[in-house]
Amino acid sequence: MSVADAMPETVDPGAASCPALFVAAPASGQGKTTVTAALARLHTRLGRRVRVFKCGPDFLDPQIHAVASGAPVHNVDLGMCGEADIARRLHAAAREADLILVEGVMGLYDGAPSGADIARRFGIPVDRKSVV
């Protein structure tokens, strides 16, 4: 499923499709920010346009990701931003980017909504082979 497939009806899906990956871990402090920033930097250096999103109301990690990707970073927080706003931002990113990275918060199944809930809601794949 692509990001465009998960858009609510209020968003015109248009022709937006882009590979996306949700970066998750079993708990906090496991290196999600480091891995996300490293992936963003690697793909940016390879000439790809990378857009990074951060789950939760975090304002420090997005600054790291903005430096790594060279692009603004937005939060994915349903309480703060709302589903329609997040969907619009993901859709806009899919139109202009070559890769979307979304960094989870805490463990994959921690919190309500959890990172797994967010990934499912917006159609962002989580590589289960990498999940420990």
Regions found by a protein language model. Give the residues of each.
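ATP-dependent carboxylate-amine ligase catalytic core
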Residues: 5-125, 130-132
